Amino acid sequence: MATLTDVRNALQNAWTDDMKKAVKNAYRNAEKRASQGGNYAKCLEQASMQGTPYSLAAKKCAIENNLASTLSGLWGTS
């Protein structure tokens, strides 16, 4: 699963502005999907079991789940 650290690293390692823009767009799209989709509910449940402030933890988890597929699509990896 991609993490927010992976996004930061991808931005630091991107060698063109186009790649940086693609990573930023992937993050924004993942963030939008996180607030709309089923990942959010699943992550809310997971966060509440961990006893963390669940709205932030769930949003972060859902964004990371969505980023995993988006970033792998950008680089053609799984």
UniProtKB/Swiss-Prot annotation:
GO terms for molecular function: DNA binding. One of its GO terms (cellular component) is viral nucleocapsid. Keywords: DNA-binding, Viral nucleoprotein, Virion. It is found in: Virion. Its main location: virion. The keyword Amino-acid biosynthesis does not apply. Homodimer. Completely wraps the viral circular dsDNA genome to form a nucleoprotein filament. These interactions between the viral genome and the nucleocapsid proteins probably maintain the DNA in A-form. This certainly protects the viral DNA under conditions such as the extreme desiccation of its host. This is Nucleocapsid VP1.
